[in-house]
């Protein structure tokens, strides 16, 4: 299982946002939507062995489960509609018990620390950061949990949590990449057994 945890610092925590302004009034929700599509879509299929956790304002986590996912299309607007639907049902989520809001999409009342603690029990936590060790020097883990930030750097408290809980801190190359592009490169790294098998 491959997992991606993406922190959305400015992401909305209520469903009152316009699908027509994802890059503005919706707090750069467009970045998170592109991360979701990069994590799941192949040319003519969906990666079923992937799980994505979107941290919305350190208040809610929306999880996409590849094996159960339905109604996901490769455009930002339809992905944002799934997130908005999840937020519409946020009152149904009790504590850390998720509410399934559509097939393969659920919401929990949990921020970054709670989500990180949960995924760390089941996988190898890998922080993606431009100042990390080159990924080519790291053996591909069998159950990686890649943690990355949106268009902002990790906040100090997030960086401290990752310093304590991450098994690896890696860089995907000499240049800083967009979050969604980083997911594509991470997939390629795993698909090719560390860029060894094509």
Swiss-Prot record:
TM regions (residue ranges): none
EC annotation from Swiss-Prot or TrEMBL: 2.1.1.257
Main location, first listed in the record: cytoplasm
One Pfam family of this chain: Methyltrn_RNA_2
Keywords: Cytoplasm, Methyltransferase, S-adenosyl-L-methionine, Transferase, tRNA processing
Alphabetical GO biological process terms: tRNA methylation
InterPro entries associated with the record: Alpha/beta_knot_MTases, TrmY, tRNA_m1G_MTases_N
Keyword S-adenosyl-L-methionine belongs to the record: yes
Catalytic function, reaction form: pseudouridine(54) in tRNA + S-adenosyl-L-methionine = N(1)-methylpseudouridine(54) in tRNA + S-adenosyl-L-homocysteine + H(+)
List of residues binding S-adenosyl-L-methionine: 128
Gene3D superfamilies reported in the protein's UniProt record: 3.40.1280.10
Localization in the cell: Cytoplasm
Cellular component GO terms, alphabetical: cytoplasm
Family assignment from sequence similarity: Belongs to the methyltransferase superfamily. TrmY family.
Functional note: Specifically catalyzes the N1-methylation of pseudouridine at position 54 (Psi54) in tRNAs.
PANTHER family according to UniProt: TRNA (PSEUDOURIDINE(54)-N(1))-METHYLTRANSFERASE
HAMAP family the record matches: tRNA_methyltr_TrmY
Protein name as annotated: tRNA (pseudouridine(54)-N(1))-methyltransferase
Source species of the chain: Haloarcula marismortui (strain ATCC 43049 / DSM 3752 / JCM 8966 / VKM B-1809) (Halobacterium marismortui)
């Amino acid at each position: 299982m491959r997992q991606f945890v993406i922190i959305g610092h400015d992401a909305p925590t209520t469903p009152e946002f316009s699908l027509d302004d994802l890059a503005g009034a919706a707090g750069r929700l467009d970045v998170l939507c592109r991360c979701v599509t990069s994590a799941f879509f192949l040319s003519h299929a969906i990666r079923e062995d992937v799980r994505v956790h979107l941290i919305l304002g350190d208040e809610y986590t929306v999880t996409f489960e590849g094996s159960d996912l339905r109604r996901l299309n490769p455009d930002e607007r339809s992905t944002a509609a799934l997130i908005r639907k999840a937020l519409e049902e946020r009152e149904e989520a009790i504590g850390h018990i998720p509410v399934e809001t559509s097939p393969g999409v659920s919401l929990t009342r949990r921020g970054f620390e709670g989500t990180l603690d949960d995924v760390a029990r089941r996988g190898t936590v890998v922080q993606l950061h431009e100042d990390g060790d080159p990924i080519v020097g790291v053996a591909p883990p069998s159950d990686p949990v890649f943690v990355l930030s949106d268009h902002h750097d990790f906040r100090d408290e997030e960086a401290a949590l990752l310093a304590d809980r991450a098994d690896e801190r890696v860089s995907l190359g000499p240049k800083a990449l967009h979050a969604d592009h980083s997911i594509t490169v991470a997939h390629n790294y795993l698909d090719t057994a560390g860029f060894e098998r094509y």
